[in-house]
Amino acid sequence: MSIQLITFDLDDTLWDVTPVMQDAEAALRNWLAMHAPRLGAVPVEHLWSIRATLLQAEPMLKHRLSELRRRILLHALTDAGYAHADAQALAEAGFQVFLAARHQVELFAEVHPTLEALANRFQLGVITNGNADVRRLGLADYFQ
């Protein structure tokens, strides 16, 4: 039996995720400051409290990070006094800002040559609980 398929996680495998997430969080905070001023400088402890409450009610959200982030934003915006429909629109728009910044990654130097060499011999796949998209990253041609 020979190896036919190799799968990869993305974060911290193909790039260092810490600076990416820090930048994405900063982009979201800056966007929220401009577009949702009632939210103000919400204490991070409040966001962690919302997160804990959501995960207690729906433990499977820990595997659906995009949905979890959207819901945290929605709750924080609602708590800040935005009407539900406005909070939903702001949460989704803010999430899209976060997601765009989250795809501004700096691949490790050896990623392209390694994936190219492996893709010539094996099927390559991605298994991740994150929200990085190989199509948005210009890596889709390596994966099936």
Regions found by a protein language model. Give the residues of each.
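Substrate-recognition element of Asp-dependent hydrolases with the DxDx(T/V) motif
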Residues: A89-Q104, V111-F143
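Residue-level preference for short coil/turn positions at secondary-structure junctions
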Residues: M1-S2, N120
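N-terminal helical cap/lid subdomain that shapes the substrate entry/recognition surface
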Residues: S2-F108
